Amino acid sequence: GQDAHAVHDGKATPPFRIQLLQEYLAKKLPELGASVSALPRETAGSLLLFGHCTERTEEVTSQEQWRTIFRAFGLELEPQATGCCGMCGVYGHEAEHYDESRGVFDMSWGKRIPGDAAARRRVLAQGHSCRSQVKRFSGFVPRHPMEALRDALEGATPAE
């Protein structure tokens, strides 16, 4: 494959559409049909999805797409009503923005992140920056939704 810049000049609609992972998977589910019903199930309760703020605003159905995918595999997923994690790309890494970054995290994500280790294993976060921010302020790295799906399908128990 070629880099998108090599095949598209930006002046017209490109001959391709880049999709988010969950967009692609949600569209592929009907093709999988009954084959997903026989897969192993995770029984530890519903998983908590903390969505990447930019992704949620650019693709407003992204959280519901994840929920649809997880349900197809017999897993319950609860998208959390949160705002920005406070990382905001490089902004949150800059020393002069630490207090503001922490404040944004505490106003939203910090109030919803569970305190005990068992509940934290159910926390999923889409964005790399979001997972970094949770590690920074809550002391653990949440799994990406695809990691949780893989773990459930393989019968693995996530590490504490």
Go through the PLM ranges and name each one.
Residues 1-160:
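Iron-sulfur cluster-binding electron-transfer modules in prokaryotic oxidoreductases
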